[in-house]
Amino acid sequence: MAHPLTRRKFNALTVALSSVWLASSLGLVVTANVAQAQAPKGPEFKLIKPDQTPDVEKGKIEVIEFFWFGCPHCNGLEPSVREWKKKLAPDVVFKRVHVPFREEKHQQLFYTLESMGKVEDMVDKVFYAMHVEHNPLDNNKKMVEWATKQGLDAKLFEQTLESFGVKTKMKKASNLAAAHQVDGVPALTVNGKFYTAPSMAGSNGHALRLVDQFVEQERKAKK
């Protein structure tokens, strides 16, 4: 089974980010317990200690995906996340947090797109550029050229890229990742309490099923 990307492992990545996440060989079987509200006991997840306070309205449940654009595992998870999001209940707030591992320019790109209100429209296109077209998007010139090809206002994009607001978002994201004890990506957290990842759960699908289970547990705890 592929292992999560860590700071130490990032240096081993090549510029052509074309790795493919190997299918899990653990032979994990999803049982009816996954649908129950009681959290499982085992290495498929860990508890975040101390708990982190969710940044959502009262009564809402926060789910965070910690990721990096350059990560092939995150690219592999994206289609599953896209389908999973379509079924989210109104009380679940899904957030993406881009970690600062290895390439801060990618974090800067994400928060520039977010500040422009374009992140959901562009996430798939960024992954495609990096992992299919092998465009590293690792400096301002490449990012501005890419943004222009996507129909974004080049001047506004460049101004936003170097804005104080984006730098503030980057710092907040980095602090959030540290507080949630993120040491590899992709990683998924629920309400600042539960932490799982495809590498821990055995597959993308099982990781998301665990997230659903933790969401249900938090929902019942609020009643």
Protein language model features and the residues they cover:
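Sec/Tat-exported extracytoplasmic proteins
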Residues: 67-70, 81, 85-88, 113-117, ...
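C-terminal cap of thioredoxin/glutaredoxin-like
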Residues: 5, 9, 149-223
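Solvent-exposed loop/turn segments at secondary-structure junctions
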Residues: 70-73, 100-104, 128-133, 163-166, ...
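Extracytoplasmic thiol/disulfide redox context detector
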Residues: 2-103, 216-223
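Periplasmic c-type cytochrome electron-transfer domains
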Residues: 38-48, 135, 140-141, 210
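Extracytoplasmic/secreted envelope proteins and their assembly/folding machinery
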Residues: 78-85, 106-110, 123, 140, ...
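Structural microenvironment flanking redox-active thiols in thiol-disulfide oxidoreductases
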Residues: 87-116, 120-147
